[in-house]
Amino acid sequence: MTMTRKLILDSDGGVDDAQALLMLIAAGRTPDAITTVFGNVGLDAATRNLLTVLAVGGRPDVPVHKGAARPLNQPVIDAKYIHGEDGLGGAPRPETIPQTASDNAVAFLIDTFLAAASAGEKVDILMIGPFTNLALALRLEPAIVAGIGQLTIMGGTIYGRGNTTPAAEFNVYADPEAAQIVFTAPLDIVIA
């Protein structure tokens, strides 16, 4: 019998992220936790959007940890021109949404991956926003790599065609220093 590893979703809360989260829920692969990051919209809007999707998707029990509000070394950019001012294209929202579990996604990632490593386990992570949360965690505690299973990333380009500039994909472009930290870490990375 194959055991499914725990899954963390790291997301910047845009329309594509909402769809991805709903697809995970529908497929029976609801993340065990979500960490939020700036990107498509600011951190507060991204967090609110993911809490909204969890409420609408019938999974308000999933803990959400608020993460990085800005890139490591450059000004913040967003993709409101695609996702709308609120990040969900103005979609209606429920009257109540769950609360965040914490305001420190980086500490949550460090604690989770170190605990997994000490138990001889690994936790998978699906990153569909800028890589800042994981980069900060790796910078603060490099030993977390022992507890990270498969890292699946929505980022980068294949054939050199970007969606933000002629050669840059948004999630990498939003924080290239964070992307470099993650891509050079000794991890099992899948770019999807």
Question: What residues fall within each predicted segment?
Answer:
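Surface-exposed loop and adjacent secondary-structure segments within mature catalytic domains
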Residues: H65-R93
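A glycine-rich helix N-cap at a beta->alpha junction
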Residues: V53, G57-H65
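Active-site histidine-anchored catalytic micro-motif
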Residues: T2-S11, V15-T52, P92-A192
